[in-house]
Design a protein with these regions (language model features):
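A glycine/serine/threonine-rich, flexible loop-to-helix segment
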Residues: 1, 41-64, 104-110
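Short-chain dehydrogenase/reductase
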Residues: 19-20, 76-79, 83
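Short, small/polar-rich loop/turn modules that mediate ligand/substrate recognition or access, typified
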Residues: 27, 32, 90-92
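A conserved structural motif in NAD(P)-dependent oxidoreductases
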Residues: 63-75, 86
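Short C-terminal tail/terminal secondary-structure segment
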Residues: 91-110
Length: 110
């Protein structure tokens, strides 16, 4: 069986693969589909994790090259970009709003 981390990572990959497969199909009808991949974001759920004696240190030490955690408004701004005219030529794209974590941790080869 999958543990929570494997299931979480697998679900993120599934969403991206689904979105990228649909992008060229929907583009024929003028429909764009993109994704925002948020990093660790300041939410009540994150705060509960930070307060947890078992998980708090691991969360605080999670590698974020820019440091700290995202503010929810930063994630909302990325979503607003994809909804606006500025992204009218974007489809099948993933915008990472994670302080550089993906750039740091993504392997060069899969």
């Amino acid at each position: 069986t999958l543990d929570g981390f494997q299931a979480y990572g697998g679900s993120k990959n599934a969403v991206v693969r689904w979105m990228r497969k649909l992008a060229p199909v929907w583009a024929k009808d003028g429909v764009r589909i993109n994704a925002v991949a948020p990093g660790t974001t300041q939410t009540p759920l994150l705060q509960a994790g930070l307060d947890d004696p078992l998980w708090g240190d691991a969360i605080r030490n999670f590698p974020v090259p820019l440091g700290g955690f995202a503010d929810p408004q930063q994630i909302a701004s990325a979503l607003a970009f994809f909804l606006g005219e500025e992204s009218s030529f974007c489809t099948g794209s993933v915008l990472f709003v994670d302080g550089g974590t993906d750039a740091l941790m993504r392997p060069d080869k899969f």
